[in-house]
């Protein structure tokens, strides 16, 4: 039986690309035509985020690493990734693929030793990003804590980044208040889950 390269296996399928394409920014009408296919660049971004490799180690088949990074950084500043996520989440809810029984939990991402030297005066910061870049020193060293609200069907409804030393309990209400799932047509977005599950780390809240 032939094997499939792991990286290729996780690339977007034709059906997934057809679903994603209408949500992307329209192509530029001026300037030189795009040399590298947008689909390859998007797959390059997804590969890097999935495996956590340095940008320079993104496989060449996706395009030049700097071009993949440029797409990621540009769309990050423009809020494109957030809009894509919100649109896909709304579509999943309208199709009945969200149960609204959620779990709240957190995880630590350890930072590289050089991360403590990140600039605090960058003008290319994403809207709302704090000066500390959600980087703090806990017992295990420098890191970032991700607080997430996960639907029973494994869909991420909201997440919040804090410095690694921050506790779980104080962030429970803030991350739950970040839930926002748009509805098709008019009407307010849905923000309240039916049931919330959490471990003992949140019992004091």
Residues covered by each model-derived region:
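Short alpha-helical elements
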Residues: 1-205
């Amino acid at each position: 039986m032939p094997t499939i390269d792991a990286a290729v296996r996780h690339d977007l399928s034709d059906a997934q690309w057809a679903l994603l394409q209408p949500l992307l920014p329209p192509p530029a009408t001026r300037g030189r035509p795009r040399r590298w296919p947008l689909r390859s660049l998007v797959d390059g971004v997804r590969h890097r985020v999935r495996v956590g490799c340095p940008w320079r180690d993104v496989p060449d088949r996706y395009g030049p690493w700097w071009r993949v990074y440029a797409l990621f950084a540009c769309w990050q500043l423009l809020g494109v990734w957030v809009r894509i996520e919100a649109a896909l989440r709304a579509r999943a809810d309208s199709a009945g693929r969200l149960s609204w029984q959620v779990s709240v939990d957190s995880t630590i991402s350890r930072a590289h030793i050089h991360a403590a030297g990140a600039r605090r005066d960058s003008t290319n910061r994403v809207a709302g990003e704090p000066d500390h870049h959600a980087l703090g020193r806990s017992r295990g060293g420098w890191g970032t804590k991700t607080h997430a609200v996960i639907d029973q069907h494994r869909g991420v409804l909201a997440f919040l980044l804090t410095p690694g030393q921050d506790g779980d309990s104080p962030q429970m209400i803030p991350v739950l208040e970040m839930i926002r799932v748009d509805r098709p047509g008019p009407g307010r977005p849905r923000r309240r889950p039916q049931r919330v599950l959490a471990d003992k780390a949140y019992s004091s809240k």
